[in-house]
Amino acid sequence: MLRFAVTLFAVITSSTCKKYSCLEGETHKLKPSPEPNMQECTLYSESSCCYANFTEQLAHSPVIKINNSYWNRCGQLSKSCEDFTKKIECFYRCSPHAAHWIHPNYTAGIQSVPLCQSFCDDWYEACKDDSACVRNWLMDWEWDESGVNHCKNECIPYSEMYVNGTDMCQSMWGESFKVSESSCLCLQMNKKDMMAIKYLLSESSEESSSVSSSEERACQKKLLKFEKLKEEEGGETR
C-alpha cells in the first residue's frame, strides 16, 4: 500500500510539473497565467505561456515575420495556409501543455507532440499550392549574423516539398510533431484539445508510444458528447 501511494504521488507530481510549467524559450513565461488581451492564440488565453503582446505579431494578415524569422521568403502565405501555421506557432509559444512534450535535450523545444491525422491532412491541403525553400523550418535555413533566416535553395510548392500531410507534420518542425495512430488521443489545435489532453496527460511514460485502449474508448465517448453538445448549441443559435 505504501509503495502504491509513493508511486502514485510520483506520477502526480511529475504530471503536475509538466502541466503547470512552460517551455524555456526566449518568449516563454516561467509558468502559465491568464492573458485576457491576446489578439491571437486566444485558445490559450485562460492559461498562457506567452504574453499578450507577443500575439500582436500574429494579429495582422499577412504575417511577415515572428521575431527574426520571416514567413514570406517564398511569397506571402495564402490565408488558409497562414491560419494553420498560426495554430502551430500559437501552440508552441502559448500552450500551457506544450511542456508535457519538452525535448529531453533542448528545453526550449518539443518532441513527438501527437497531432491528429485529419489535422495534418487539412494543413497539407491548405498549404499544398504555397511555396517553401526549406523542408525543416527549424534547421534548414541559412541564418545571417543578425539571426535572420534566408533561403538556401529555390522555392518549390509544398506539394513537391512534402509527400502528404503525414510527411509535412513530421518534417516541417523536425521531430517536434508526430501523427497519432488515434483519432481522439491527438491534438487538432482547437477546443477539442482540452478533452484529448486530459487523457494524454494521464498516460504513463511507458505507455506514451502506444495507445491505451481504455483511454481511447473514454476519449471517443467524450468526443461524441462534445460534438453532440456543439450541434445542439448550433441549433439553438439558428
Swiss-Prot record:
This is Riboflavin-binding protein. N-glycosylated. Keywords: Disulfide bond, Glycoprotein, Phosphoprotein, Signal, Transport. Belongs to the folate receptor family. One of its GO terms (biological process) is riboflavin transport. Expressed in egg yolk and egg white (at protein level). One of its GO terms (molecular function) is riboflavin transmembrane transporter activity. Required for the transport of riboflavin to the developing oocyte. Pfam families: Folate_rec. Disulfide bonds join 22-49, 41-90, 50-94, 74-155, 81-127, 116-186, 120-169, 133-151, 184-219. On the 2D-gel the determined MW is: 47 kDa. PANTHER family: FOLATE RECEPTOR, RETBINDIN. Residues 1-17 form the signal peptide. The modification Phosphoserine is found at residues 204-205, 208-210, 212-214. GO terms for cellular component: external side of plasma membrane. The keyword Ribonucleoprotein does not apply. InterPro entries: Folate_rcpt (IPR004269), Folate_rcpt-like (IPR018143). Glycans are attached at residues 53, 67, 105, 164.
